[in-house]
């Protein structure tokens, strides 16, 4: 397996020169492949997904060159990367990590397979016609998470909590879906949701400060916010307000806990779909969108963080945890 991470300008130059040697995309007959990876931004959850995706090819014994590009959170860069991959005849398949990256890639890449991961609502993001029958050249794995169970953690550690704050990027469709789910779950749990919208990670500090007075903070799988999680965690500890996350990696970075998916396993599931497309000739249009097996969801708690937030995790909850993180 080979990894090639070209500077974006160099990659664009290659495309502009028209160096488009024909690949053998999806035929199942090629002995080696080139896979482009369009990742929205770097943070542990998305990096874990990328790692798991590549691991699937190792396990399958395929000879693959990965061309990895990171848009650093810039949608214009997502589009440029996607266009480069679309015009590069050597690229057999494109992987897209996170909803904005998947949307930009699907818009630009029409004649080769696209496999997404870290996308909460594929149909709502207009990536597929339906989960069961995607219908085009795009399929992948959703990271839809159990929002109600995650918010329940706040009630478990702070039973008198009545409000929860959520900072999210208004430009990320996946985040809006989770906020709507949080509002519905909040009605059942007795939690009023207070929102603060941002447009990029540099606004997270201002956004979280606008949530003054809430009893807890919920961090959805919003890439702008997760990439600046330490800002949210720092505010939570300063104000003694517990921070609950939607992803496991954020617990290791200081959130109190979550009930969520393993992003490396999530990425590997997407990688296995890509292997089916390249090695076996499977058609994305006929590969149903994948979801995490509920049995594989993990309860991960950080008792040290809980203490910093001024709350204690009940012993019964600790006993049920799949993992206790210290730090």
Model-derived segments and spans:
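Pocket-lining segment of extracytoplasmic ligand-binding domains
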Residues: 173-247
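Beta-alpha junction/loop-to-helix N-cap segments that form part of ligand/metal-binding clefts
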Residues: 68-129, 222-237, 241
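Extracytoplasmic "Venus flytrap"
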Residues: 32-54, 60, 67-77, 171-175, ...
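C-terminal motif of bacterial Sec signal peptides marking the signal peptidase cleavage site
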Residues: 18-21
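Hydrophobic alpha-helical segments within soluble ligand-binding/sensing domains
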Residues: 122-163, 262-282
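Bacterial signal peptide processing site
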Residues: 23-25
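Hinge/cleft segment of the Venus flytrap/periplasmic-binding protein
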Residues: 276-327
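An alpha-beta-alpha
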Residues: 35, 39, 53, 139-186, ...
């Amino acid at each position: 397996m080979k990894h090639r991470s070209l500077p974006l300008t160099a990659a664009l130059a290659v495309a502009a020169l028209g160096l488009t040697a024909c690949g053998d995309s999806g035929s199942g007959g090629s002995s080696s492949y080139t896979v482009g990876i369009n990742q929205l931004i770097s943070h542990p959850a998305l990096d874990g997904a990328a790692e798991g995706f590549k691991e699937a090819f190792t396990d399958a014994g395929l000879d693959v060159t990965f061309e990895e590009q990171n848009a650093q959170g810039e949608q214009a860069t997502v589009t440029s990367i996607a266009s480069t991959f679309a015009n590069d005849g050597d690229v057999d398949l494109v992987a897209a990590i996170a909803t904005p990256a998947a949307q930009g890639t699907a818009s630009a890449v029409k004649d080769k397979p696209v496999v997404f991961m870290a996308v909460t609502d594929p149909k709502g993001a207009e990536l597929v016609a339906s989960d069961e029958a995607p219908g085009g050249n795009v399929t992948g794995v959703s990271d839809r998470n159990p929002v109600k169970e995650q918010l329940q953690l706040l009630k478990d550690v702070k039973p008198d909590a009545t409000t929860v704050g959520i900072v999210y990027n208004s430009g990320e469709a996946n985040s809006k879906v989770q906020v709507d789910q949080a509002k519905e779950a909040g009605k059942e749990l007795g939690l009023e949701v207070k929102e603060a919208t941002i447009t990029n990670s540099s606004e997270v500090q201002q956004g979280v400060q606008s949530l003054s007075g809430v009893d807890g903070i919920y961090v959805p799988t919003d890439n702008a916010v997760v990439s600046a999680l330490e800002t949210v965690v720092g505010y939570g500890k300063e104000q003694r307000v517990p921070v609950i996350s939607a992803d496991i990696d954020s617990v290791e970075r200081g959130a109190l806990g979550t009930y969520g998916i393993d992003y490396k396993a999530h990425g590997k599931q997407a990688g296995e779909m890509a292997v089916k497309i390249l090695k076996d000739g499977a058609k994305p249009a006929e590969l149903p969108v994948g979801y995490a097996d509920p049995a594989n969801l993990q309860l991960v708690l950080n008792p040290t963080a809980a203490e910093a937030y001024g709350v204690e995790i009940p012993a019964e909850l600790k006993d049920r945890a799949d993992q206790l993180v210290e730090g």
